[in-house]
Structure formats: structure tokens, C-alpha cells
């Protein structure tokens, strides 16, 4: 019970849905439902917990759409000829698969979903600094997704998720314009959300919480938000200029009219390589919370892991040109960005070392969350090793635009980011819903996902080394066998989503009741009731 001036707030803990919190103001009693109703999640709600769940559910729906596009592409690539999809439709699927997975699945779920739900709870704040701005940031995402889907009615954007001109200027201009507008909306959402996170973490944490007590997830979100604020406006500027070239007769990037396509690449990659860290830094934060809890051992090297997030934020702004080693980059620039690319691996290695040291000697519980965390360690190290090879200009020149790049990218972002999102869902599901997920279905989900990931993406390294170009619907028949293996793996990945979806829905509706702190975790969000109602106290 809390008393402040003439207000009395009575909040029953661990009560079943339907109970009410009683607020007495100036002698008048007001009754408020303790639990949110299902329809509250479809409204312009300013509660950070509701917004976090809105992000997670919406992002997962887009994940299913992007996954269907991926399975369709892999079905096409099972044979050398374009006998299933029209090549133009294949290009549209390829473009929008990448766009949806990056901008509407990983970024919204990792930052918007977990960040909004957890950050205020972890730092002891009542809500985000700007609740209405927070809601606006979320509601910019669904229209962006609808614009991307609507682009298929106009031929679909076919220039890849990078939208390089001049290709993006000559294929399906209406669809390309819709695609640009969608990314600008998502970018605006990212800027608003990042500003909110920075203010919340810096100025709204409880005064008694010292900086060396701030949860590592919050350090990761802080670094991610600063990086997004510095890089996202640059992408928005480049895309707006591209939109002008498409619709208003300008020639910023038209080579035949004096435009410079390399300038676009600089503008795009100044954001889009830091975007990789936007997608993986929050996952690093999730790992730093999940591993010590399920290893039942304090995190090893707290300060090193916290500061390494900030180091990645800084160094990550100076590595973008390694995507442009084949774009006529001068030798001195190749040398500088090769070195900076290798340097960024150092703070990442600090995190890996800290997690492995935490596991060493721990009393590990092989829960679904822990299995995905350990799987992420293996997948990300694999992706990191291939990334170090591509960071060196002499090697990158040979494998650029081959399937070697596709393999590396997916080991980092699927084996890294998606595994981490799954780990976070299994870990915080009891706090979000008040229910436990089924561990048997969770382990089946992990096994299928782990096998499918390696079967899909491991052979792509060999395909790239043999010279198979990426982003093609037809290929030389000599690559058929390895592509068949990749397609089988993609089918397994598609099937792996089924037990997870069943598990999440069934557990949310009728799963085993969870206690306030089923994992015996130590961060502040676990001191509230499960699920957290409209009002909560620590």
C-alpha cells in the first residue's frame, strides 16, 4: 500500500485476471481492472508493457510473412531453372524478404519489443520518458509493413534490400517509391524510440541504482539507441534523394545525368552496417541476462561487457566501407576500413569470452532459453569467423556478391539475432503472460531450428567459394546438389516455427501458472507480479 498526499493506492499481488485495483482520491473510490483486456492491445495504448507486447506480436507476424517468402525462394532454387517463380517475382521476394526480416522483425522485436517491456522495469521507472511518443513509434510500423505488401500490386520492389541505383531507378518505380516510404516510416519509428530509451535510461533510473548496477540489457539498449540516432537520419536522407530521382526529375544518383551512385552507397552503408549492430547489440543484452540466470552464476566481467557495448557503438560507425571494396575504393581507404573492421571484433570477443567464462563451472539448467543462448554462441562465432575473413580486402574482392556473403549474414542475423529473440521469449514469457512455456515443445523447436539453420546456411559457404552469385533465380547446374541441401534445410526451418507458435499460443491461454520469479533471477522486473498488471510496485 502506498500513500501520497490524499491518494491511497491498493494493489493486490498475484491475483487472477478480473480482479481490480482500488484507487482512493480525495475520498472517492475508483476501481480499475488489474489486468489488460485483449482489446487493449489493438488500441493506442501508452503503457510500455502493452507497447512491448504489440511490438513482439506484430513483428512475429511479419516474420511469418518474410519466412514464407524465404521458403518460396529456396523452393525455386532447388532446381537451376526458374520453373516455380517468375524471375521478377523472385526478385521482389528477395528484396522484401530481407526488408521485412530486418526492419519489421529483428529490429522491432529486439529493440521495440524487449526494450519497451523491460527497460523501465529494469531501471525502476514507472514508464518510458515519453509514453505517447512511444505509442506513435510503434504505430508507424504496421503502415510501413502494409506499404511493403502493397508494393506487390505494382510489380514489387526488385532492387534488393540495398536499393542500389541505377537498378532501383528503372524497375517498378511505384513499388520502389512505396518501399522507400515504408523504410522512412520505420526509420522515423526507430529515431523516436531511440530518443525515448536514451532519456529513460539516463534520467529515469532510480537514484539508488549506480551505473555498475544497471542491467547489461539496458547498457546494450543504450548503446543501440545512440547508434540509431547517429546513423538512421543518414539513411533517411539518402532514400529521400532516391525518391526525388524516381518521381521529381532530380539526378542525384542517375549516372546518365551526372549523378553519383557511389554517394548513395556511402549514405546507405553508413546506416546499414551499424544496422547490423542495431540487430545484434540488444541480443547481446538478452544473452547477458539469460546466461547467468540459467547457469546460476554471476556474469563474468560485468564492466568489460558493459563498456564493450559502447565500444561497438563507437567503432561500428567507422567500418561501413568494407561493403564497398569492389566499388573503386582507393587502396588507403581499403587499408583503413580493413583495420577498423577487424578492431570491431575485439569488443565482440570480450562479450563471447565473458559468456563462456560465465558458463564455465556454472550449474547449467538446459531450459529452452538456455539452449537457444548456447546455440547462439555457436552460430555467432561461426558467423564472426567468416566475417573476419570478409573484412580483409584481398579476400572480400573474391567472394563479394557470392553466396559466401549470404552464409555469413544469415549466421550472424539468424543464428545470432533470431536465436537470441527466441531465448528472450522463452526467458521472459512467464513475466509477460504469467504462464510457463512447455519445455518439451521448446526443445523440439530448438532442435529443428538448430538443424535447419546449419543445413540451410553452412553449404552456402562452399557455394560462394565456388563462385555462385547471390540474388539470382537461375544458376549453373553444377551448383544443384548443394542448393538442394539448402532447400531441405529451409523446409526444416519453416517447420520449426510450428511447434513454437503452438507452444506460445497454448501456453499463453492455458499454460502452467508461473510464479513471480520462476528462474530465481535478480533484476528488478522479477520483483513484480506475473503477469504485470496495469499498476505495479517493487
Please place each PLM-identified region on the residue numbering.
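...captures the hydrophobic TM-helix bundle architecture rather than a specific catalytic motif
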Residues: 3-538
Amino acid at each position: 500500500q502506498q500513500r501520497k498526499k490524499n491518494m491511497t493506492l491498493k494493489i493486490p499481488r498475484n491475483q487472477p485476471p478480473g480482479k481490480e485495483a482500488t484507487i482512493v482520491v480525495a475520498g472517492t473510490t475508483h476501481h480499475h481492472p488489474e489486468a489488460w483486456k485483449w482489446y487493449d492491445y489493438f488500441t493506442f495504448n501508452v503503457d510500455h508493457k502493452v507497447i512491448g507486447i504489440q511490438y513482439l506480436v506484430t513483428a512475429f507476424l511479419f516474420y511469418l510473412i518474410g519466412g514464407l517468402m524465404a521458403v518460396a525462394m529456396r523452393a525455386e532454387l532447388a532446381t537451376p531453372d526458374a520453373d516455380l517463380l517468375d524471375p521478377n517475382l523472385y526478385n521482389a521476394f528477395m528484396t522484401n524478404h530481407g526488408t521485412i526480416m530486418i526492419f519489421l522483425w529483428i529490429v522491432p522485436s529486439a529493440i521495440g519489443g524487449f526494450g519497451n517491456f523491460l527497460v523501465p522495469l529494469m531501471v525502476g521507472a514507472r514508464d518510458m520518458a515519453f509514453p505517447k511518443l512511444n505509442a506513435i513509434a510503434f504505430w508507424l510500423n504496421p503502415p510501413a509493413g502494409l506499404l511493403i505488401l502493397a508494393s506487390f500490386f505494382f510489380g514489387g520492389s526488385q532492387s534488393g534490400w540495398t536499393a542500389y541505383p541505377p537498378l532501383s531507378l528503372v524497375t517498378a518505380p511505384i513499388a520502389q517509391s512505396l518501399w522507400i516510404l515504408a523504410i522512412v516510416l520505420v526509420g522515423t519509428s526507430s529515431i523516436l524510440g531511440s530518443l525515448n530509451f536514451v532519456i529513460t535510461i539516463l534520467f529515469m533510473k532510480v537514484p539508488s541504482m549506480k551505473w555498475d548496477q544497471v542491467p547489461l540489457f539496458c547498457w546494450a539498449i543504450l548503446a543501440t539507441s545512440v547508434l540509431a540516432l547517429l546513423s538512421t537520419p543518414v539513411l533517411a536522407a539518402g532514400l529521400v534523394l532516391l525518391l526525388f530521382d524516381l518521381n521529381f526529375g532530380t539526378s542525384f544518383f542517375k549516372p546518365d545525368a551526372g549523378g553519383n551512385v557511389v554517394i548513395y552507397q556511402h549514405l546507405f552503408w553508413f546506416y546499414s552496417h551499424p544496422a547490423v549492430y542495431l540487430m545484434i547489440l540488444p541480443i547481446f543484452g538478452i544473452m547477458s541476462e539469460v546466461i547467468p540466470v540459467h547457469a546460476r552464476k554471476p556474469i563474468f566481467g560485468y564492466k568489460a561487457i558493459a563498456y564493450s557495448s559502447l565500444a561497438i557503438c563507437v567503432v561500428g560507425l567507422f567500418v561501413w566501407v568494407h561493403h564497398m571494396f569492389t566499388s573503386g575504393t582507393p587502396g588507403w581507404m581499403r587499408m583503413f576500413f580493413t583495420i577498423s573492421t577487424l578492431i570491431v571484433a575485439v569488443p565482440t570477443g570480450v562479450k563471447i569470452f565473458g559468456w563462456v567464462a560465465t558458463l564455465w563451472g556454472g550449474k547449467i539448467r538446459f531450459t529452452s532459453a538456455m539452449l537457444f543462448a548456447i546455440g547462439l554462441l555457436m552460430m555467432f562465432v561461426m558467423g564472426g569467423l567468416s566475417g573476419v575473413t570478409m573484412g580483409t580486402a584481398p579476400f572480400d574482392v573474391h567472394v563479394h556478391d557470392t553466396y559466401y556473403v549470404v552464409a555469413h549474414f544469415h549466421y550472424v542475423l539468424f543464428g545470432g539475432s533470431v536465436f537470441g529473440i527466441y531465448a528472450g521469449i522463452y526467458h521472459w514469457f512467464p513475466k509477460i503472460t504469467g504462464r510457463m512455456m512447455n519445455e518439451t515443445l521448446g526443445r523440439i523447436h530448438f532442435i529443428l531450428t538448430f538443424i535447419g539453420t546449419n543445413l540451410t546456411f553452412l553449404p552456402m559457404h562452399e557455394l560462394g567459394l565456388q563462385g555462385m552469385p547471390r540474388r539470382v533465380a537461375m544458376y549453373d547446374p553444377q551448383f544443384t546438389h548443394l542448393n538442394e541441401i539448402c532447400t531441405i534445410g529451409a523446409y526444416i526451418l519453416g517447420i520449426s516455427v510450428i511447434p513454437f507458435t503452438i507452444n506460445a499460443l497454448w501456453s499463453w491461454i492455458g499454460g502452467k501458472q508461473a510464479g513471480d520469479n520462476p528462474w530465481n533471477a535478480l533484476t528488478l522486473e522479477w520483483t513484480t507480479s506475473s503477469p504485470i498488471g496495469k499498476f505495479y510496485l517493487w
